[in-house]
Amino acid sequence: MQFSSSSITSFTWTVLITVGCLMLCASFSDAQLTPTFYDTSCPTVTNIVRDTIVNELRSDPRIAGSILRLHFHDCFVNGCDASILLDNTTSFRTEKDALGNANSARGFPVIDRMKAAVERACPRTVSCADMLTIAAQQSVTLAGGPSWKVPLGRRDSLQAFLDLANANLPAPFFTLPQLKANFKNVGLDRPSDLVALSGAHTFGKNQCRFIMDRLYNFSNTGLPDPTLNTTYLQTLRGQCPRNGNQSVLVDFDLRTPLVFDNKYYVNLKEQKGLIQSDQELFSSPNATDTIPLVRAYADGTQTFFNAFVEAMNRMGNITPTTGTQGQIRLNCRVVNSNSLLHDVVDIVDFVSSM
């Protein structure tokens, strides 16, 4: 029996789509994340990510902290699915416009360059979500922090979630009860999750606009925040005058602003936390379960590092999009065009790798 080329093509598509549907029905979406996920399919991905960050650090010393913040803000909104990287479309609003991201989230161009380099080495293989997770880990390590293997195997969302971002991202003026509720809402219910992840503010910068109330009119009293060290208050007022440019940047950590270490916690003990939500961990009347952790992390760098890695892995496992869910975006800013074609091929690749 002979078949025409068109018949073969039609048959091939039928098989592909059938396999895809069967896989979707079988739903491997509960696939477990593993550090070895790309060991065969893209063994150089970590080196590519690292090299991209190293190159960027030469001209932008802030980029490590900015990338870590992107990962944090990604994971808190529908899990770590790279939804924060999507631009506006006619179907959804970007998370970049959320209150916690607008005019503050940064690093998107370096993520673009990173993804282009990864695609050249391993086409259609590494998700933007996993790449951002690796980039966050490498940013910490390059700044002097711990090194660890991140669990991988996430896939990318098909949309952004602006309303959820506005609801889920913690604000710099949050009280400790608000912070605890915020973290618990996404499944991070241990005090160590909150205190260790807040330690990401051991490097990076913040804009004056987020601390003006602390400096001049805390809780509409016309007075500064009473938990703010008076000497530090005067330093901050010099950097952020009452009628000054509120976009001016201030170091989160006045001691070692570019180094990932435990000095953030030393600062909190001295009432030198930059934003209210940081100082709340040590100065709030509700801090009975967080003060001991602040003290422990201030006294032991390795204690902090161990807690931070554990909390990062827990955050990275918030409702991950895996298996046949979502897709592997070719450009982190947009959902793949011809998504059905890409998704079917991805499903076949997924089956082949099992």
Curated annotation (Swiss-Prot):
Substrate binds at P170. This is Peroxidase 33. It comes from Arabidopsis thaliana. GO terms for biological process: defense response; defense response to bacterium; defense response to fungus; hydrogen peroxide catabolic process; pattern recognition receptor signaling pathway; reactive oxygen species metabolic process; response to light stimulus; response to oxidative stress. Its cofactor is heme b; Ca(2+). Ca(2+) 1 binds at D74, V77, G79, D81, S83. InterPro entries: Haem_peroxidase, Haem_peroxidase_sf, Peroxidase_pln, Peroxidases_AS, Peroxidases_heam-ligand_BS, Secretory_peroxidase. PROSITE patterns: PEROXIDASE_1, PEROXIDASE_2, PEROXIDASE_4. SUPFAM superfamilies: Heme-dependent peroxidases (SSF48113). It holds the Pfam family peroxidase. PANTHER family: PEROXIDASE 33-RELATED, PEROXIDASE 72-RELATED.
